[in-house]
Amino acid sequence: MVTLTLLEKIYGLEEDRSFRSLQKHLSSFSSGLEAKIKVLGKTEQNWIQVEVSGSDSVVATNYLNQKFGLAPSSLEELKVQSELQGKIVDSGKIGYGLYVDVGVSASKKRDVLVPLYVLRKQLFEDEKLSIRRIIEAFCLHDNFPLRIKMTRIAIDKSEMEAELSEAQLTAFKNWVSLGLDRVIVLGASPEQIEYAIKKSGSMRDIIRVDRLGFFECSLICKLGTEAPGIISRLGNLLEGVPLYAFSPKKIKSFLKKAS
């Protein structure tokens, strides 16, 4: 029997419903194994903890690592050049970058800083945009899942910096080049999303749902459909769930000015 911390956070107004959704998914996966995956609860930073038991526990653990990612057990696991999955925290509260919680277990909370100058260079060709403009453009709000690559770690681990990983950067570039609006949903289960899309009559206007995390997703709008219109339809059905509009046109206008 082992207790694991998944790189998934539980948050929002309907935590019980979210826990049930995740447990249903995990039980469905483990039904064909000699293993049981039980959702225990969450850590102080809202990371989900599960208990894995049974003779197939190694298989189940590997699945959890591939599907969700497992939080580092200590600061010593963090190395320069290593890639990590995390969630944005305290978005917009500082002007010099974004902090990412990577789930590391430590006596004192340690988040990784992606500096403003790095975000400008990677996302906007060094255009001198404020952190708030960058956050709004790419919907980089609290709990947005972000994959980063460590670039600097202080000897005492008190300060850590990173840049966007190549995979994360490629994903963002693809979002822009595709040219389609997206609705970024932060804090809703797959069942909630499916219900809201059907109930609002938005099935024809949303061509695909891309999972960013178990409780986060990107709704890709069809050509000619704008994200704010979809948000107005979904808002009442996803009460309390943050919804953000991603507009490639807006980002391209920033890049055009930069050139």
Feature-to-residue mapping (PLM):
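S1/OB-fold single-stranded RNA-binding interface
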Residues: W47-S53, S57-C139, N143-T151
